[in-house]
Amino acid sequence: MNVNQTMADNQQRCELKLIASPGSWRLYSARKIDERFKSYEQKIFQRDRYTCQFCGFQARLYQDIVNLDGDYTNNRLSNLVTACCFCAQCFFVESVGVGGYGGGTLIYLPELTQAELNSLCHVLFCAITNDTGYKSSAQNIYRSFKFRSQIVEEKFGEGTSDPAIFGQLMIDSGVNSEEIREKLFKNIRLLPSRAKFRKQIEKWAASALEEIAD
């Protein structure tokens, strides 16, 4: 088999999109706490080397498993991939920030793909948390991203930079055409919340410092 082709297929397969769909979150969260899924989950983490298949972030902690086709009844190994918590929440836009799950803001950012933004946020949050020489620059970049939420609200209305509100509006309006969904989400990205992921960020940052010290 052509290795380059396999890699190209994999990259294409793991393109990160924002998705809002009724029912998926319920099945996903039920599976997450199902003890029977734990050993299956470990198989996937090991296969993917604990690496997010969307943004490339590698960590032993707080990685999730998502279904590539968005069907949470299709739990074949080939349909399941490792996703960091920033990328995983993109599959459940309507549930972001609801009941303690995830957190973030919808922003207008045509310059970066969603996966690129998530990857950059891992770097920014680590720089801020570990109080590196780049802390102030990282804070400024993150702040400038957050400011982009105003463009979303100007276009779609007050409150629509809240992913749960935007996602629920999409579900309620019955948008199930891929073409319309892509148009609505065009150039819109989900900016992960530093405050909501504080626990995860602090653990990752501590691990990064340990690796440097080793």
UniProtKB/Swiss-Prot annotation:
Principal place of residence: cytoplasm
Signal sequence region: none
CC per GO annotation: cytoplasm
InterPro entries: HNH_nuc, T4SS_Dot/Icm_subcomplex
Record-linked SMART domains: HNHc (SM00507)
Any GO BP: protein transport
Record's subcellular location: Cytoplasm
Record keywords, A-Z: Cytoplasm, Metal-binding, Protein transport, Transport, Virulence, Zinc
A molecular function (GO) term: metal ion binding
Chain residues that bind Zn(2+): C52, C55, C84, C87
Subunit composition and interactions: The T4BSS is a complex nanomachine composed of several subcomplexes. This subunit is part of the Type IV Coupling Complex (T4CC), a subcomplex composed of the DotLMNYZ core and the IcmSW-LvgA adapter subunits, linked by the C-terminal tail of DotL. Six DotLMNYZ hetero-pentameric units may assemble into a hexameric nanomachine, forming an inner membrane channel for effectors to pass through. Interacts directly with DotL. Interacts with DotZ.
Functional note: Component of the Dot/Icm type IVB secretion system (T4BSS), which is used to inject bacterial effector proteins into eukaryotic host cells. Part of a subcomplex which recruits effector proteins and delivers them to the core transmembrane subcomplex.
Entry-linked NCBIfam families: IcmJ_DotN_IVB
Official protein name in the record: Type 4 apparatus protein DotN
Source species: Legionella pneumophila subsp. pneumophila (strain Philadelphia 1 / ATCC 33152 / DSM 7513)
Gene assigned in the entry: dotN
